[in-house]
Each structure stands twice: as structure tokens, then as C-alpha cells.
Amino acid sequence: MRTNPLVLGVSALVEKNVGRIAQIIGPVLDVSFPPGNMPNIYNSLIVKGQGTAGQEIQVTCEVQQLLGNHKVRAVAMSATDGLTRGMRVIDTGAPLSVPVGGATLGRIFNVLGEPVDNLGPVDARITSPIHRSAPAFTELDTKLSIFETGIKVVDLLAPYRRGGKIGLFGGAGVGKTVLIMELINNIAKAHGGVSVFGGVGERTREGNDLYMEMKESGVIDEQNISESKVALVYGQMNEPPGARMRVGLTALTMAEYFRDVNEQDVLSFIDNIFRFVQAGSEVSALLGRMPSAVGYQPTLATEMGSLQERITSTKRGSITSIQAVYVPADDLTDPAPATTFAHLDATTVPSRGLAAKGIYPAVDPLDSTSTMLQPWIVGEEHYETAQGVKQTLQRYKELQDIIAIPGLDELSEEDRLIVARARKIERFLSQPFFVAEVFTGFPGKYVGLMETIRGFQMILSGELEQSFYLVGNIDEATAKAMNSKTES
């Protein structure tokens, strides 16, 4: 950790090593330095000067290649408009560093760690470089443990691993944002943890909408900003590829501080991991590298691995990462999603069909998967209950065509029983969220894992349809059923 001249301002830099711009090709700069004073790979360079219209220019770049003849090739982290050949370039002598710690909570940052929310400067006394090695094997926590979210459908059928990576698939309008906000809320309340959201190459409008919804739901506390539960880092799709390629590392660096120094459980969101790969592909082409399969960068697996391997549990704390995964043209064999899948421990798949029925969270119980759902990890009771729920829902899915045309009367007695239980399960998988109280009118519920297992065991064994809709644990469903009987 050290003082960060990029955040304090260029005036704080000691101009030990100064070069000049030799060539500009879009967001790529070639810079000449004096012999014997070449900057290292990943060093941060700052271009200062005046543009053609007399405006002050300050562009931060990152060294990517040493070309020979005392030249380096760097990629800009912001627009290169107004830069000219011959401009002075200062070598900071270190990689890009960003603010970390409690001061980042409730704030929005860009890739450089600069606040962009108009709420004033951030306490930048503690900073950390964005390029770091993954934790050593001896530091890792090798124990397999479930990361309890308090969301029934997730904890029972596709449990998250503490320090694992989860892929979040799905289109617009199925409740991904609300699910993300509920996870942020629950980790703060149940685990005393914090969250870091990395907006990588997505729409600016989506970033703004998320910020507004977080303020409305209390995840970000405007009145007492230090009580907020999340830090936001945005590198949106209108920014140069260098910024989109590095913004994920900026967010991860902030998360690592909470894990390693504050010894907390951290939830890290990356939306969207495909845009990280896409930005790397653009930078690779700009640097003149030979493309690999489908035009992707030859270093795709290396870049993905260097990001993903930093997301893990250590003996101090954990980073559990939820990554939105865009699948281009729905082709799962595309190198970008295929490389991502190799790192995932679980997948959460929102369902448009469930959302249309008004069942929220609209997580598909059959398509969502987890490597943690093994009897030797979660225990026999949890495993058997989850398998029973899946078998019932799968049989119900197979019977849908018969129900739609001839009707329920054509089913056998056993199948009718399965349909009745599956409908109860489907309703019981719904749950009121704390962050959605404002628009559902139902108080939010956090349901512990043991309560979840007990509830589904009771349904599978043939006990208590409407009683299961938007309730927390099984006792509430029982009370609701008793009230209905009394009223009738």
C-alpha cells in the first residue's frame, strides 16, 4: 500500500523519467524515452499538456510492449482526443494504483480509482496496485464450505461456494438487478461483509439505473455514506478498450483489500465478463498480435486465468464472485464463454417463464447448477431434499403437454399428486426480498439453510398451494394455511 500520485494529482509526481509521444494510433501511443530509462511493462504513464484548443489534457496510459529503439507502446485509459506527437509523457515508475478501504463504500469510481459521482474527493491515503499475483497456495482456505445467501432457491438447489465463482445468465427483465441487490444486502446483514460491483463494458444507462435503485433500496445510504454496503467501479461501453480491459482489475483490487486486510467476506460482481474478454481482444488487435480462434486474442486463457485466480478464499477472508455472462449468438462453444465456464463453480439461470408467472426470484430450479451439490459436501439430508425437489419439478415439466390439452383429469392419481406437490414447491421457491419491499408490499425474509431444507422436506412428504406464495420459512406457510382455514 502506498500514496497514489494518480489520485493526488500530477503535481505530486516527481518527473524523474520523461518521454515524448512518437506515434498515436487511436487509443495506442508509442512513446520514446531516453536510453537506459525504459519504463517496465504495466507501468502507468501520464501525458500532460495542452490540446489544440488550449484545454488542459491529462491522459493515463499503461505500458504494454517494449518495442526497441528506446520506444514503448502503451494503451490509453481515456480518450486520446487532442494529443499530438512530441507531447511530454511522465513515467510514474509503478503500475496504476487505486484507493481501497472503507472510504470506497457508497462511491462510484472509474478505472483510475477517481470518483465520478460528484460527491467530492475520496480519502486516497491507502492505495493498492491493480496488478497483483494470486494468493499463494499456502494462503488458500482449502475447506469446501457453502456461502449461505438466505435465498431459498439458491441455497437448496444451486448453492454458492465460499470463495467461488458463479455465472449469472439471462436476458433483460427477469430480475437480475434485484437479485444482485438482495445478495449485497444479505451479505452485509448475515456475514458482516461488503460488496464491490464492477461494471465492465455495459451501458451507461444500466450503471445509472443500478445506482439509483441501490439508493432507493438502502444498499447505498446517501445520508451516511460510510454505512453503505457496496463500492461501484464503472468502465462502460463508450470508454476506450484499455479502460474496459482494466476496470475488472480495479474492482477486484478493492475487493482484495476487504478480504486480506479487513478479513471480511466479500461479494464481487462483474457485469459483464464477456466484455472483459472483448476489450482484451480489441487491445490485442491494436497491439498487432496475431489473432487466435474466432478473432480472439492469443492470450485469452492467460488473461482470464489471471483475473479468476485472484478470486478465492484465503485463511483471512473470501471473495465470492458473481459474473454476468453474455453468450454471443447463444453459442456456448464460443471461446469467450467457453473459457469462462472452466472457472465457474455454479450457475444461476433466471427464467422468463417464472417471471411471467410472477414467481420471484425467477431462478430456474432445473437449469441452475452447482458443483457444491454433492452429498459429501452439503450432507445427505440437503442432497436428498434437493434431488427430490428436482425430480418432482422435472416430472411436472414432462406432464405440461398433457395438462395443456386433455387436462388434469387424464393423469394418473400418482401424477396428479406430483403436479400438486410441484405447484407447492414452485410457489415456495418464491420469496419476498428486503430490497423489493417498496414495490411488493411484503416484508423481506432471510431464510437459513436448515429452515429451507425442513420446509421442502415437509412438501415432499405431502403436507399443506397459495400458502407457499411469498413467505419466508415453512412456519409462515403453515400459519398462512391455518388463517385461510379459519377465514373459510
Curated annotation (Swiss-Prot):
**UniProt-annotated binding residues for ATP:** G170, G171, A172, G173, V174, G175, K176, T177
Gene Ontology MF terms: ATP binding; ATP hydrolysis activity; proton-transporting ATP synthase activity, rotational mechanism
Any Gene Ontology CC annotation? chloroplast thylakoid membrane
GO terms, biological process: proton motive force-driven mitochondrial ATP synthesis
Tell me yes or no: is Nucleotide-binding among this UniProt entry's keywords.
Answer: yes
In what way does this protein cross or attach to the membrane? Peripheral membrane protein
PROSITE patterns annotated for this entry? ATPASE_ALPHA_BETA (PS00152)
Instruction: Tell me where it mainly resides.
Output: plastid
Enzyme Commission number(s) of this protein? 7.1.2.2
Catalytic activity annotated for this protein? ATP + H2O + 4 H(+)(in) = ADP + phosphate + 5 H(+)(out)
The entry's localization annotation reads: Plastid, Chloroplast thylakoid membrane
Key word Transferase present in the record?
no
Keywords, alphabetical: ATP synthesis, ATP-binding, CF(1), Chloroplast, Hydrogen ion transport, Ion transport, Membrane, Nucleotide-binding, Plastid, Thylakoid, Translocase, Transport
Instruction: Indicate the family of this protein.
Output: Belongs to the ATPase alpha/beta chains family.
Q: Which PANTHER family match?
A: ATP SYNTHASE, ATP SYNTHASE SUBUNIT BETA, MITOCHONDRIAL
- Subunit structure and binding partners: F-type ATPases have 2 components, CF(1) - the catalytic core - and CF(0) - the membrane proton channel. CF(1) has five subunits: alpha(3), beta(3), gamma(1), delta(1), epsilon(1). CF(0) has four main subunits: a(1), b(1), b'(1) and c(9-12).
For this entry, the protein name equals ATP synthase subunit beta, chloroplastic
Instruction: Say which species the protein is native to.
Output: Picea abies
Q: What is the lineage of its organism?
A: Eukaryota, Viridiplantae, Streptophyta, Embryophyta, Tracheophyta
Q: Which gene encodes it?
A: atpB
